[in-house]
């Protein structure tokens, strides 16, 4: 498998870019977010890649970060989501925004992506739940390490993500971990 490509960017033709590596030009499908982040043609670039070999084609998908590639790989495992739809999702939402949408179960945010209907969005939320948040830490309250620790403790105690997030919202700013867990449990028991 081709995991990463470094070379000279010779062409941008959305959603495909062409990267020259020692005289060989690789056509790589990229999400629009990656395309916009790339420098002008002629510059040296590195893309994290995912290779798909089918009977009739070999397709190379490229991403600006390994987190974006990992998210793509998780997305294509979801029933009804192919590589093109996964690229559309990553074009419309950053990895952090997708993780937040999954954590907060926001079907409306996902249905704004072309190719994602209500049922597909619900399936995506169901199958992706718990697969991104821990890796990326993109929950709305993850800015503080303490809140992340409190959230993980509540989840480990068996509370749902929704309940845990609601309890976190009620905590005062700057609370330490042990006090935060105590206050969150108190809020959850009510």
Curated annotation (Swiss-Prot):
Residues 137-141 are annotated as: Flexible linker. Residues 1-64 are annotated as: Domain I. The keyword Zinc-finger does not apply. Pfam families: HHH_5, RuvA_C, RuvA_N. Residues 142-190 are annotated as: Domain III. It comes from the Bacteria. One of its GO terms (cellular component) is cytoplasm. Residues 65-137 are annotated as: Domain II. Belongs to the RuvA family. Homotetramer. Forms an RuvA(8)-RuvB(12)-Holliday junction (HJ) complex. HJ DNA is sandwiched between 2 RuvA tetramers; dsDNA enters through RuvA and exits via RuvB. An RuvB hexamer assembles on each DNA strand where it exits the tetramer. Each RuvB hexamer is contacted by two RuvA subunits (via domain III) on 2 adjacent RuvB subunits; this complex drives branch migration. In the full resolvosome a probable DNA-RuvA(4)-RuvB(12)-RuvC(2) complex forms which resolves the HJ. Has three domains with a flexible linker between the domains II and III and assumes an 'L' shape. Domain III is highly mobile and contacts RuvB. The RuvA-RuvB-RuvC complex processes Holliday junction (HJ) DNA during genetic recombination and DNA repair, while the RuvA-RuvB complex plays an important role in the rescue of blocked DNA replication forks via replication fork reversal (RFR). RuvA specifically binds to HJ cruciform DNA, conferring on it an open structure. The RuvB hexamer acts as an ATP-dependent pump, pulling dsDNA into and through the RuvAB complex. HJ branch migration allows RuvC to scan DNA until it finds its consensus sequence, where it cleaves and resolves the cruciform DNA. HAMAP family: DNA_HJ_migration_RuvA. This is Holliday junction branch migration complex subunit RuvA. It comes from Bordetella pertussis (strain Tohama I / ATCC BAA-589 / NCTC 13251). The lineage of its organism: Bacteria, Pseudomonadati, Pseudomonadota, Betaproteobacteria, Burkholderiales. The gene is ruvA.
């Amino acid at each position: 498998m081709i995991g990463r490509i470094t070379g000279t960017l010779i062409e941008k033709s959305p959603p495909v870019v062409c990267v020259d590596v020692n005289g060989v030009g690789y056509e790589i499908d990229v999400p629009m977010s990656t395309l916009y982040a790339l420098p002008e043609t002629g510059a040296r670039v590195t893309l994290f890649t995912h290779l798909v070999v089918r009977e009739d084609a070999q397709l190379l998908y490229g991403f600006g970060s390994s987190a974006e590639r990992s998210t793509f790989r998780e997305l294509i495992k979801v029933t009804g989501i192919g590589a093109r739809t996964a690229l559309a999702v990553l074009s419309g939402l950053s990895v952090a925004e997708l993780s937040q949408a999954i954590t907060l179960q926001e079907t409306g945010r996902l249905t704004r992506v072309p190719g994602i209907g209500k049922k597909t969005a619900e399936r995506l939320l169901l199958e992706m739940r718990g697969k991104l948040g821990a890796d990326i830490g993109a929950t709305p309250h993850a800015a503080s390490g303490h809140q992340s620790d409190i959230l993980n403790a509540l989840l480990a105690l068996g509370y749902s993500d929704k309940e845990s997030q609601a309890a976190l919202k009620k905590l005062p700013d700057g609370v330490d971990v042990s006090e935060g867990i105590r206050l969150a449990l108190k809020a959850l028991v009510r």
